[in-house]
Amino acid sequence: TVLNGVVTGVSDGDATITYKNNKGCTVTKIVTVNGLPTVTAGADQTICSGSSATLTSSTMSFYNWGTGATTQSITVSPTTTTTYALTGTDANGCENTAQVTVNVQDLPSVSVSTGSSTLCVGETVTLSSTVSGGTWSSSDNSIATVSGGVVTAKSVSTQSTATITFTSTANCTGSITVTVNPELTISGTMTATVGGSQPVLLINANTTTTASSWSSSDQNVATVDATTAGKIVPVGPGTTTITYTDATTSCPTTALFTVSAAPSITSTTTEVCEDGSLTLTATPSG
């Protein structure tokens, strides 16, 4: 369109502009109107807090981002969800704009909800995340497994650690380390007779334990010696549970200990002549 000599482009193409003076003389001019360029800044992106995003424009002659950058691609690290504006200029000097939004998601924070992050074999701990939704995983299922935030310690021979990770639906992660103490094993003679020998039990074939770490569930069957670690004193017939609790980790282990009654001795009266002899025979009662 033309108004008072000012030509305004309406759509792309060529237009002939004619001027006629008061004497009837005319002059013409062909005006070319270039279309606006198509400018894009890429699809909206979602990042985790503390991460960065790369924004890339469609190919233009000149670029002007709202950040002040003038390159085709820029890297941004917003702390909150932010929309970025872009002005692109083509070879004809025509400009157009575009926008792209970078959504920022919080990082999950993982903590112990119930229990402790240091576990004995078979124990559990419940974890929680500050972000809802998502999945849990363990770096080593042979050390600890996790389901719904509940971690279960597996059997290990030495103190071991596993990293438990929570991954949100936005693929943002938070983690915590759990420690699993080694499984203990009681070994030695697990039977005795009332009045008989007093066996000494071992932990993982190691005698360096303390007497206070041992206990018996039934003092009427057997007690533990107060001064000698692992020494069991049979008291009466029956079965008792012997427990060893590690002084450092507080992890317990148990074993059944059986005590049998002492054999009974019975005799009959037999008369012999003076200077005679008698053969005595002992027969076990059981």
Where are these regions (language model features)?
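Short, exposed coil/turn segments at beta-strand boundaries within extracellular/luminal domains
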Residues: N21-T28, A91-T97, C120, S168-S175, ...
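Append "Rare intracellular matches occur via the same short Y/T/C beta-strand/loop motifs
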Residues: D12-K23, F62-Y63, T80-N92, G133, ...
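Low-complexity "stalk/linker" and mucin-like segments enriched in Ser/Thr/Pro/Ala/Gly
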Residues: T1-N4, G42, N64-Q72, S137-V150, ...
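Short, solvent-exposed loop/linker segments at the N-terminal edge
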Residues: Q45-S51, S117-E123, T191-Q198, T270-G276
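Interdomain boundary/hinge segments at the C-termini of tandem beta-sandwich modules
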Residues: V31-G35, V100-D106, I176-P182, A255-A261
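Solvent-exposed segments in extracellular or luminal domains encompassing
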Residues: G5-D14, Q72-T87, A91, G149-T161, ...
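Proline-enriched interdomain boundary motifs that mark the N-terminal boundary
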Residues: L36-D44, L107-G115, P182-M190, A261-T268
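A short beta-strand segment in extracellular, disulfide-stabilized domains
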Residues: S51-T59, G122-V131, S197-N206, G276-P284
